Structures are given as structure tokens and as C-alpha cells.
Amino acid sequence: MPELPEVETSRRGIEPHLVGATILHAHIRNGRLRWPVSDEIYRLSDTPVLSVQRRAKYLLLELPDGWIIIHLGMSGSLRILSEALPAEKHDHVDLVMSNGKILRYTDPRRFGAWLWTKELEGHNVLAHLGPEPLSDEFNGEYLQQKCAKKKTAIKPWLMDNKLVVGVGNIYASESLFAAGIHPDRLASSLSTEECDLLARVIKAVLLRSIEQGGTTLKDFLQGDGKPGYFAQELQVYGRKGEPCRVCGTPIAATKHAQRATFYCRHCQK
């Protein structure tokens, strides 16, 4: 599933081609996604795009009378086309722009979403979200307050959007390795120093992935159709049985909430 760096990479890739241009029309080939494509999107015509924003893993296209909320789901991706290339099987949505560009949404598993809302505030998919991990609000003090009485393993807690948004399976594993914290540790067992380190490491890992264009494991592509390159820098994720790049111990794997977790038995305590 695309996580925060992949969604932010997509946002940065499509923004220059959309902002200041006008949506001439939308071509919906298959509107049966996780939720049906909103009727308002079918009716788009001569609609300027004012901004392209992100909240958690949602892309937000600001229009004069409302917002398009896009979620990439498990396997979705967005590409900017310079010409109307023939659509393939999983190309479900096109936004045809006044500048000759086409924003094409591809989603093999159809678990993404294209929704319309008049106002963002209070929308059910955006309500109750925690802070952005790259914001000043997310820091060691905040993390310690939220972990202090939490009797659950730190790995799944990091992936809870009520704590912090956008830290999915890949980056939770990578951040815990970088901080030297075992994923099975109870959140409440983390010290002040560990919470401070973990908050800083999460920011650093996410920023590095954004710089590399995200992590391409299977379906994710950047806005220009190129893969992300952070996969080449993964320290533990997807490396079960391979030697730790720091100490040589074979990388171990376990599961939290049915999600694979990767870690080093020697480096993480």
C-alpha cells in the first residue's frame, strides 16, 4: 500500500501539471472502487484546479466549489500523460486538462477512492486523524504522552492514524530499526529519550524516502511513471533471513495485526 512518502511523491509529481490548469472533463471507465466514484466527479467540466494538497494518505484537489479526495488504496497510482495513450485494463479514471495533460489513475485492485466534498472539515475519511509526522506537533514529548499508558506493542501503535498519520508498515519497521527499538516492546515501556529519538528518526526516514521518490515494491510509480528508489535503502523491511547491514545477524520477521514486521534481534532492544 502506498504510504505517506509515496502519496507525497505523487502530490509533488502532479501538482505542476494541474494547478493553474482547468479540468475539461473527467473520463470514468470504472467507477466501482472501494467506494463508488462521486457523481460530482462525473460532471466535472471547465473546472480550474486551485491547489493539490495532502492529508495523511489522501490527495486533495482544491476546486472553486469543493474538493476531490483521492486515496490510492492498496495498488493505485497516478501518472501525468502528455498525450491520450490508449487505456489499459486497470486505468479507471482520467482527468483531461486544458494544458494538454491527462491525469490517469490506475488501480489493479480497485481499493482506492475518488470522492467529492463541499468542505473538508468534518468529512468522515479525514476526521479523527492524528498529526502529520513531519509537523512540529509530532515530537518526542507528544509521542511520550501518547505512549505512556498504551499497553500495546509499539509497532502497531505507530501505524494507528489516531497517533500519527502516514507511518505505514514499511516505515514503521524501518524507523524502529533506526531507533534501535524492538517492535514487540510495549509502547508504555519507551523512555523519554527513546520517544524523542523515535520521533526524530520517523521524520528522517520519511524525508529520505520522499527524496528518493518513495518505495517501489510492486505497483507504485511516481507521477512521471518512474519507480521510487527508497527500496534500495531498506534496512529490514522485506529482508527476512538476509544479514543485517549493521551487525550481520539474519533479519527476523513476525506479525502484528496480520501485518509483517521485520527487525534485527541484535540491534533492536
From Swiss-Prot:
Name this polypeptide is given: Formamidopyrimidine-DNA glycosylase
EC assignment: 3.2.2.23, 4.2.99.18
Catalytic activity line of the entry: Hydrolysis of DNA containing ring-opened 7-methylguanine residues, releasing 2,6-diamino-4-hydroxy-5-(N-methyl)formamidopyrimidine; 2'-deoxyribonucleotide-(2'-deoxyribose 5'-phosphate)-2'-deoxyribonucleotide-DNA = a 3'-end 2'-deoxyribonucleotide-(2,3-dehydro-2,3-deoxyribose 5'-phosphate)-DNA + a 5'-end 5'-phospho-2'-deoxyribonucleoside-DNA + H(+)
NCBIfam families for the chain: fpg, PRK01103.1
Protein's job: Involved in base excision repair of DNA damaged by oxidation or by mutagenic agents. Acts as a DNA glycosylase that recognizes and removes damaged bases. Has a preference for oxidized purines, such as 7,8-dihydro-8-oxoguanine (8-oxoG). Has AP (apurinic/apyrimidinic) lyase activity and introduces nicks in the DNA strand. Cleaves the DNA backbone by beta-delta elimination to generate a single-strand break at the site of the removed base with both 3'- and 5'-phosphates.
Active site: 2-3, 57, 259
Annotated keywords: DNA damage, DNA repair, DNA-binding, Glycosidase, Hydrolase, Lyase, Metal-binding, Multifunctional enzyme, Zinc, Zinc-finger
Signal peptide per UniProt: none
Residue ranges covered by zinc fingers (FPG-type): 235-269
Swiss-Prot/TrEMBL cofactor(s): Zn(2+)
Top-level lineage group: Bacteria
Gene: mutM
Pfam families per record: Fapy_DNA_glyco, H2TH, zf-FPG_IleRS
Cofactor detail note: Binds 1 zinc ion per subunit.
Gene Ontology molecular function: 8-oxo-7,8-dihydroguanine DNA N-glycosylase activity; class I DNA-(apurinic or apyrimidinic site) endonuclease activity; damaged DNA binding; zinc ion binding
UniProt: DNA binding residues: 90, 109, 150
Entry's family note: Belongs to the FPG family.
Subunit-level organization: Monomer.
